[in-house]
């Protein structure tokens, strides 16, 4: 993947950069692997905003991705590398020898014409999926399951990769991209390699309108609001926030306060993320 930088023909173009999309080989998605995606605009089933700053954006179809990789022992050929508007990574269209087609997250280095396979007896090769127990130590992996048979939920964003550090008993020790070290069961599946589209983090949107195309609405500072709307609001001119620690819109401590609460998996974390 390359990045194109425009000449500064306007204020928006001056700081804009876009992907060259040179790895994309197919423009239209596979008809049997898409479904309509209704816009939620950050609302729940009661119509109330649960995620702020969402709304608008270009219409999308959802691409059905195979995160489970549960078609064991059947080889598949990579037919195309495609763009997916619903994620930062590219996706690869696989055609299995039995005629079925599926999408997977495209790892770095996977090309059209390559053959991939999943299962405990698959080779240690980019794009192949195996249980953690069958993967050698030190291997870079992505699309990792947390629960056996649930499908990959970890390390799916563009350019990310985890590393298999150790195996002890029924569990493998994995170092995550965030620096967190955690234990995952050896029967959980993972895919070999690093997620592709590694230059995604270097793309600059350049203008507010491009954020709106992605469905991201403006984020207003608390200090620019009224006191009734935010703890930082009010005052004459640019007033200090008037409290020792910054607060959220709802008066809870912000910045650096842990919000994670998942007791089921907390006990498997060996070292917290950096």
UniProtKB/Swiss-Prot annotation:
One GO process term, biological-process aspect: cytoplasmic translation
Biased amino acid composition, Basic and acidic residues: 227-239
Keywords carried by this UniProt record: Ribonucleoprotein, Ribosomal protein, RNA-binding, rRNA-binding
Coiled-coil portions: none
UniProt cross-references to Pfam families, sorted A to Z: Ribosomal_L2, Ribosomal_L2_C
Gene3D superfamilies listed in its UniProt record: 2.30.30.30, Nucleic acid-binding proteins (2.40.50.140), Ribosomal protein L2, domain 3 (4.10.950.10)
A GO CC annotation given for this chain: large ribosomal subunit
Biased composition (Basic residues): 249-259
InterPro entries, sorted: NA-bd_OB-fold, Rib_uL2_dom2, Ribosomal_uL2, Ribosomal_uL2_bac/org-type, Ribosomal_uL2_C, Ribosomal_uL2_CS, Ribosomal_uL2_dom3, Ribosomal_uL2_RNA-bd_dom
A single GO molecular function term of this UniProt record: transferase activity
Domain of life, source organism: Bacteria
Region of interest (Disordered), ranges: 220-259
PANTHER family on file: LARGE RIBOSOMAL SUBUNIT PROTEIN UL2M (PTHR13691:SF5), RIBOSOMAL PROTEIN L2 (PTHR13691)
Function of the molecule: One of the primary rRNA binding proteins. Required for association of the 30S and 50S subunits to form the 70S ribosome, for tRNA binding and peptide bond formation. It has been suggested to have peptidyltransferase activity; this is somewhat controversial. Makes several contacts with the 16S rRNA in the 70S ribosome.
Sequence similarity: Belongs to the universal ribosomal protein uL2 family.
Complexes and interactors: Part of the 50S ribosomal subunit. Forms a bridge to the 30S subunit in the 70S ribosome.
Protein known as: Large ribosomal subunit protein uL2
Organism classification: Bacteria, Bacillati, Chloroflexota, Chloroflexia, Chloroflexales
């Amino acid at each position: 993947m390359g990045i194109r930088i425009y000449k500064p023909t306007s204020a928006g173009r001056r700081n804009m950069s876009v992907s060259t999309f040179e790895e994309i080989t197919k423009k239209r998605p596979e008809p049997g692997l898409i479904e309509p995606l209704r816009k939620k605009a950050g609302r729940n089933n009661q119509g109330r905003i649960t995620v702020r700053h969402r709304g608008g954006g270009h219409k999308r179809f959802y691409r059905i991705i195979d995160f489970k990789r549960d078609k064991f022992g059947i080889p598949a050929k990579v037919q195309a590398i495609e763009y997916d508007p619903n994620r930062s990574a590219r996706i690869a269209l696989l055609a299995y020898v039995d005629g079925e087609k599926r999408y997977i997250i495209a790892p770095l280095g996977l090309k059209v014409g390559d053959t991939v396979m999943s299962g405990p007896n698959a080779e240690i090769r980019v794009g192949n999926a195996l249980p953690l127990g069958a993967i050698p130590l030190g291997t870079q992996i992505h699309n990792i399951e947390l629960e056996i048979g649930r499908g990959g939920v970890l390390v799916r964003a563009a350019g990310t990769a985890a590393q298999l550090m150790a195996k002890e008993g029924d569990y493998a020790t994995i170092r995550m991209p965030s620096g967190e070290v955690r234990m995952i069961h050896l029967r959980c599946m993972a895919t070999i390699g690093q997620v592709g589209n590694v230059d995604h983090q270097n793309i600059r949107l350049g203008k507010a309108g491009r954020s709106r195309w992605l469905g991201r609405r403006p984020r207003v500072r608390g200090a620019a609001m009224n006191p009734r709307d935010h703890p930082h609001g009010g005052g004459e001119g640019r007033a200090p926030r008037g409290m020792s620690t910054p607060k959220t819109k709802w008066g809870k401590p912000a910045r650096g306060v842990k919000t994670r609460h998942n007791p089921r998996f907390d006990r498997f974390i060996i070292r917290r993320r950096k």
